[in-house]
Amino acid sequence: MGVIIYSVLISFLFSILQGPLFIPILHKLKFGQPIREDGPKNHMKKAGTPTMGGIIFITTAIIAMIIMRKNLNSNAVFAFVCFFSFAMIGLIDDSLKILHKKNEGLTSKQKFLLQIIVSAAISYYAYIRFGSDTFIPFLKITWTLPPIVYMAAVVFYFVAVTNAVNLTDGLDGLASSVTILVVTFFTVVSFSWHQYELSVFCGIIVGILLGFLKYNSYPAQIFMGDTGSIGLGGAVAAIALVLKLPLLVIIVGGIYVIEVLSDIIQVSYFKLTGKRVFKMAPIHHHFEKLGWHETKVVSVFSIVTVILCLIAFLSLI
């Protein structure tokens, strides 16, 4: 347990120290976040807020992994590689947005293709390394999938989780707060299941986000960008996969799921009827339109995530 605490503290320290160094540089380089014109009007004041904060995640994770290398194994390295690979996709997307000076990076097809390629490589390695067993929450049984079905499911899973976390990153501190709770849950589970090295990696991610939240909470001084949100999605997906608990992400990451479903429902219903189900999607914007302040949305979504984590614990008992 002491090693996990060290991993949290080390990554927290390097994360929080990089803020004052990194944010002014991004300002000077004019690496500001373009704001979607059809979004909430009160978000327009955020235009120009530095983005690509996910670079802090990458540098801190690398430093922490090196420092904690004696307490890590191939499972932890696998989770890091997944995090890093998806963060690189996000970095490309963020770079293009800044280059174009608009909220337009990779096209949906380009981003989807890159995610498919990375996920396919991950799925093949995961099958070879971990097999195709998947734990079913509440039923407490293990389901063994045929190789092709397993690898296809893993591809879908990674693409879904990374995009879900990306969609959740729409309010100051929202994705950071929710993901801290989700990864803390997996820290406890991995430790209790004797996956000590993986729990150290989880601790690194938690520490990074705790430090970053100092600058990302309302009013945000920096955004994590796609570099951070897609990278975090890769980390969450990988951690759960190593534990053979990908289905549990549906529960602990319930906010991610709701964000995606609200977007799908909104688009599908509008195409069919020309009307909207929500005032705006993803659903965090719907609550803003109802008059909720950003901080209230983040607080309520975090509380919901705590409850979902408790339910998830019950599914494993």
From Swiss-Prot:
Membrane topology: Multi-pass membrane protein
Protein name: Phospho-N-acetylmuramoyl-pentapeptide-transferase
Function, in words: Catalyzes the initial step of the lipid cycle reactions in the biosynthesis of the cell wall peptidoglycan: transfers peptidoglycan precursor phospho-MurNAc-pentapeptide from UDP-MurNAc-pentapeptide onto the lipid carrier undecaprenyl phosphate, yielding undecaprenyl-pyrophosphoryl-MurNAc-pentapeptide, known as lipid I.
PROSITE patterns: MRAY_1, MRAY_2
Molecular function GO terms recorded: metal ion binding; phospho-N-acetylmuramoyl-pentapeptide-transferase activity; UDP-N-acetylmuramoyl-L-alanyl-D-glutamyl-meso-2,6-diaminopimelyl-D-alanyl-D-alanine:undecaprenyl-phosphate transferase activity
Catalytic activity field: UDP-N-acetyl-alpha-D-muramoyl-L-alanyl-gamma-D-glutamyl-meso-2,6-diaminopimeloyl-D-alanyl-D-alanine + di-trans,octa-cis-undecaprenyl phosphate = di-trans,octa-cis-undecaprenyl diphospho-N-acetyl-alpha-D-muramoyl-L-alanyl-D-glutamyl-meso-2,6-diaminopimeloyl-D-alanyl-D-alanine + UMP
Cofactor(s) this protein requires: Mg(2+)
Native source organism of the sequence: Clostridium acetobutylicum (strain ATCC 824 / DSM 792 / JCM 1419 / IAM 19013 / LMG 5710 / NBRC 13948 / NRRL B-527 / VKM B-1787 / 2291 / W)
GO CC annotation: plasma membrane
Gene name, Swiss-Prot/TrEMBL: mraY
Family matches, as CDD domains: GT_MraY
Enzyme class, UniProt record, top EC level: transferase
Domain of life: Bacteria
Subcellular locations according to the entry: Cell membrane
Pathway assignment: Cell wall biogenesis; peptidoglycan biosynthesis
Keyword Transmembrane helix: yes
